[in-house]
Structure formats: structure tokens, C-alpha cells
């Protein structure tokens, strides 16, 4: 069977295919294909993974948008836990507030003000970042992923509804593929959908003979990092004060918004 998703030819030329079906497994296998020769794979929750189709565009954009938007709160509040320097700065500000105002009421309100400013800047920057993504690769998934050599985009479908997305973007020079845009509808999490999507990218990388898979994330939630580790990824570094589109680098922005960018890698074979 000819595989249409190699790195030397567009992976999704009509009819769209980014890879062959998984090898046949025992009947009723949780991750095995539903029938011989079928494209989709099925999880135990009856979730099918298939290639992106043009009709999925708005559903995929919605899932991506809502998934990133969730990071507003986590970046503003939970992220402070991993920013000891800012914690110290805020403590000094609160102390100075009391020294200057001599007001216990004003001083007690200062932490709420600081958290409010963190939320404001987190929302402002993340929404700007989202708009940038929606104007670039997520504006035309078909063109950016399905028609590019070594790239592909998949959706997870449950009962006819798109509930999850993931993309793979190949880099032939480094012989690596990047796992991108993974997100699952918040109403359908905890069903193993994200792990199945991640495995789809692993399968794609192996079939295309890439040496490794890389990904980067600013996610604060521990569950996201545990997911990558469960797929075999190794944490290879973190970039403090990560810059995203939409940032102005102002003093107030640096004071109330910081991102940590985690890099992961899964080595498939030695070069």
C-alpha cells in the first residue's frame, strides 16, 4: 500500500490520507481499528480519529480557541506559584503600600489589586496571541497542514461531533516533527482522547522516518505535563519569560505577566 504522507510528497493529496490504518488488532481492542482497511481508529469511548476535512474548520478553531483561553486564569493565578521573584516584588509593593498609606484597609486591598492586574494582562496578551494564531495557521488548516509535505492535522470525533484536535508539522532539515495545536473539548476530557491524539502523531512520525518529535507548551496545569510524559516525551528545558505575539514588553506587562515555555522531546531513533 502506498503511503501518501511521506516527507517527500504532500501527505494529504486527494483523497486525503496522512497515513495508513493501524495494524489489525484483536476484535474489540480499545485502540484498534473498527474494521479491516478502515482509516479511523477507535478508542474505548468510541472516539474516532481521522484526518481533517474542510468542514471541520470552524469546529477545530473553536476547540483551539477555548483551550487556549482557559490559560488566562491559570497564567494569572496558578502561574504565580512558579514565579518566586514576582512574589517577592509583590510582597515589597504591599509593604510599601502600608508604609506610605498607614492604612490597613488599603494594604489589605493591595493583593486583590495585584491579582486583578495579573488577570487583566493575562487576558489581554493571551487573547492577542489567540488572534494571531487564528490569522495564521488556524485560519486555513487545509492549506497549512493538509497540503504541506510532512505535515498533517487530525480530529477526534465522538458521536459525529469534533471533540479534539492535533497537528504535526515536519521539519526536513532537522528531521524532526513538531506536535502542535493539541486540544480537547472541555466537556469530553478524561476519556483518553488527548493521549490517542498524541499517539497518532507518534505513528505519523515513525511512518515518515523522523528521528524525533518535539513540542513546546506554556501550560501551567500539571496534567498536561503528565500527559506528555506518559507518551514518552522527556522534558529537555524551560525558557523563563517566554515571549508570545501580542506582547509589548512594557514594564507593567513584565510586572504582571510572565510565561514559562517548556520544551519536550521524544527521540525515536538515533541519527
From Swiss-Prot:
Stored Pfam families: Acetyltransf_1
Catalysed reactions, as listed in the record: L-aspartate + acetyl-CoA = N-acetyl-L-aspartate + CoA + H(+)
Region called Disordered, residue ranges: 1-38
This protein's UniProt keywords: Acyltransferase, Cytoplasm, Endoplasmic reticulum, Membrane, Microsome, Mitochondrion, Transferase, Transmembrane, Transmembrane helix
Coiled coil stretches, renumbered: none
Major location (coarse): cytoplasm
Record's compositionally biased regions (Low complexity): 25-37
Disulphide bridges, residue numbers: none
Molecular function terms, GO-annotated: L-aspartate N-acetyltransferase activity
Name of the protein this chain belongs to: N-acetylaspartate synthetase
Organism expressing this protein natively: Xenopus tropicalis
Amino acid at each position: 500500500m502506498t503511503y501518501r504522507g511521506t516527507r517527500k510528497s504532500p501527505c494529504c493529496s486527494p483523497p486525503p490520507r496522512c497515513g495508513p490504518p493501524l495494524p489489525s488488532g484483536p476484535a474489540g481492542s480499545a485502540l484498534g481499528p473498527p474494521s479491516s482497511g478502515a482509516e479511523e481508529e477507535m478508542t474505548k469511548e468510541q472516539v474516532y480519529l481521522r484526518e481533517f476535512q474542510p468542514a471541520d474548520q470552524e469546529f477545530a478553531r473553536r476547540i483551539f480557541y477555548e483551550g487556549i483561553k482557559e490559560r488566562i486564569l491559570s497564567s494569572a493565578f496558578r502561574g504565580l506559584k512558579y514565579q518566586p521573584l514576582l512574589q517577592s516584588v509583590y510582597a515589597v509593593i504591599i509593604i510599601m503600600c502600608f508604609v506610605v498609606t498607614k492604612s490597613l484597609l488599603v494594604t489589605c486591598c493591595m493583593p486583590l489589586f495585584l491579582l486583578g492586574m495579573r488577570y487583566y494582562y493575562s487576558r489581554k496578551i493571551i487573547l492577542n496571541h489567540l488572534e494571531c494564531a487564528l490569522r495564521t495557521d488556524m485560519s486555513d488548516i487545509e492549506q497549512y497542514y493538509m497540503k504541506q509535505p510532512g505535515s498533517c492535522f487530525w480530529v477526534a470525533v465522538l458521536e459525529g461531533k469534533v471533540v479534539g484536535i492535533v497537528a504535526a508539522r515536519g521539519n526536513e532539515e532537522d528531521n524532526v516533527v513538531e506536535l502542535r495545536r493539541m486540544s480537547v473539548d472541555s466537556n469530553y476530557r478524561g476519556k483518553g482522547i488527548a493521549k490517542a491524539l498524541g499517539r497518532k502523531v507518534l505513528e505519523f512520525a515513525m511512518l515518515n522516518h523522523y528521528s524525533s518529535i518535539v513540542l513546546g507548551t506554556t501550560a501551567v496545569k500539571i496534567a498536561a505535563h503528565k500527559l506528555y510524559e506518559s507518551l514518552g516525551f522527556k522534558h529537555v528545558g524551560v525558557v523563563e519569560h517566554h515571549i508570545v505575539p501580542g506582547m509589548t514588553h512594557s514594564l507593567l506587562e513584565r510586572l504582571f505577566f510572565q510565561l514559562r515555555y517548556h520544551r519536550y522531546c521524544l527521540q525515536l531513533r538515533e541519527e
